Amino acid sequence: MNSFSPTEDTIAAIATAVSPGQGSIAAIRISGSSAIETSKNIVDVPGIQDWSTHKVLYGHVTEENRKKYIDEVLILVMKGPRSFTGEDVVEIHCHGGIIPVQKILERILAFPSVRRAEPGEFSQRAVLNGRLSLTQAESISELVSARSRKAAELAINGIEGNIQTTIQSIRKRLIEQLTEIEARIDFEEDLPLLDEKHVKNEIVAIKKDLNELIDNAKRGSWVRSGLKVALTGKPNVGKSSLMNRLSKQEKAIVTDLPGTTRDILESEIILEGIPVTFIDTAGLRDTKDIIEKIGISRTKKTLIHADLIILIFDYSSGWTNEDESILKQLPINIPLLIVGNKSDLTNDQSFEKVPKYILKKENLVIISAKTGNGEDDLINYLLKKCGSSQTHGLDIALNERQLDLAKSTMKSLENINKVFDEKLPWDFWTIDLRQAINYLGELTGEDLTESLLDNIFSKFCIGK
């Protein structure tokens, strides 16, 4: 890892989420050379309590005049380097709620030696001081924001170093090949001939391993961010009823009036470890209502960014020209499921009202949002789309930043193949090989500039 200038100032921030009436405990974190001294200056600790490392003290944070208490607290002392950041760290645990937390933080920041921490700065210091690798720090951030158990599992694997170890192994193999080639360039007469076939085979094997990581990143993205499923169709076909049925809660207003849904409504469930967000959109139709037009415009934008579109039609009334018109308006690059709703209202003629080309579609499910009939078929379809087949065997998954660098690495390795094919001198082999190594070094944090680190950690939450 690159060596950066050691941090000299002391930082402080609220380390827990704080909302009015939410959470009984909150924590303020202080890190740096002044952390312990600052803490001693704002708390009253009764009796003889030891401020040595990894001790928990009991006391009260006081007002500046030391005459009034702000709150009753526990103080956790962790002297560097045996702390999260590698520096002296003090955590003050107080009662939850905005007022006591803010007043304690204000007391701390009143000291000139302490400033408010930037987003992700505690984690950044942990990386700079060698307490964490960059990928471990990113995994901690992902654990905090995990929306499913599988996402949390992937984050824990990253914290344990699985991503770092895997990428470092690939990078080491590339360095070994670069070393072999450069040694032949510099000392060709003193060494045996380069086994070019072995080098080529090793590059092929590395590309295979890297490509697997790239493929898994897509599945990992689904696990972290979830799938967006847009419900669309003409008004009053039961889109809102279906969303309420799937989410098991009354998220949308259900009436017999066409065009009732004008806003974009969302509801989330977890299927096989993947968050699935159902988006109930305004019905697509020609209308003169200005408000409804705005809703329809939003619907079209939502459909473009969906991972799956469910087109709902009234199975009891049959497939209409309006349904056909909506079908033709849908983005062709987004997977589509057609759902015939209101099967509870069908009769013998209902089947004949639906064109054969619709009935023959593999992506067709008949359901009653009112009774739940056919719901299992719909869930099974969604499970095939985003279920166990997507998460099985998924142990590590690159985030967006890591994926971009992995793709850049792959591109460099593809360029090496062209050099092989054109039978260019060994010097040309080393150019893209060295670039690939640099990309992987940036991914793991072993080859980073301080400005890049600042950019990465600026996306973290404050206090982490």
Swiss-Prot record:
UniProt enzyme class: hydrolase
EC numbers on record: 3.6.-.-
Cofactor annotation: K(+)
Cofactor comment text: Binds 1 potassium ion per subunit.
Binding residue positions for K(+): N236, T255, L257, T260
Residues that, per the record, bind GTP: 236-241, 255-261, 280-283
Coiled-coil parts of chain: none
Gene Ontology terms describing biological process: tRNA methylation; tRNA wobble uridine modification
Gene3D superfamilies noted in UniProt: P-loop containing nucleotide triphosphate hydrolases, Probable tRNA modification gtpase trme, domain 1, tRNA modification GTPase MnmE domain 2
Keywords from the UniProt entry: Cytoplasm, GTP-binding, Hydrolase, Magnesium, Metal-binding, Nucleotide-binding, Potassium, tRNA processing
Residues bound to Mg(2+): S240, T261
Residue ranges constituting the TrmE-type G domain according to the UniProt record: 226-387
Major localization listed first in the record, in broad terms: cytoplasm
Gene Ontology molecular function: any one: metal ion binding
Domain of life: Bacteria
Localisation: Cytoplasm
PROSITE patterns: G_TRME
Binding positions for (6S)-5-formyl-5,6,7,8-tetrahydrofolate per the UniProt entry: R29, E91, R131, K464
Quaternary structure (record): Homodimer. Heterotetramer of two MnmE and two MnmG subunits.
Function: Exhibits a very high intrinsic GTPase hydrolysis rate. Involved in the addition of a carboxymethylaminomethyl (cmnm) group at the wobble position (U34) of certain tRNAs, forming tRNA-cmnm(5)s(2)U34.
Entry-linked NCBIfam families: mnmE_trmE_thdF (TIGR00450), PRK05291.1-3 (NF003661), small_GTP (TIGR00231)
Family assignment from sequence similarity: Belongs to the TRAFAC class TrmE-Era-EngA-EngB-Septin-like GTPase superfamily. TrmE GTPase family.
Protein name listed in UniProt: tRNA modification GTPase MnmE
Gene that produces this protein: mnmE
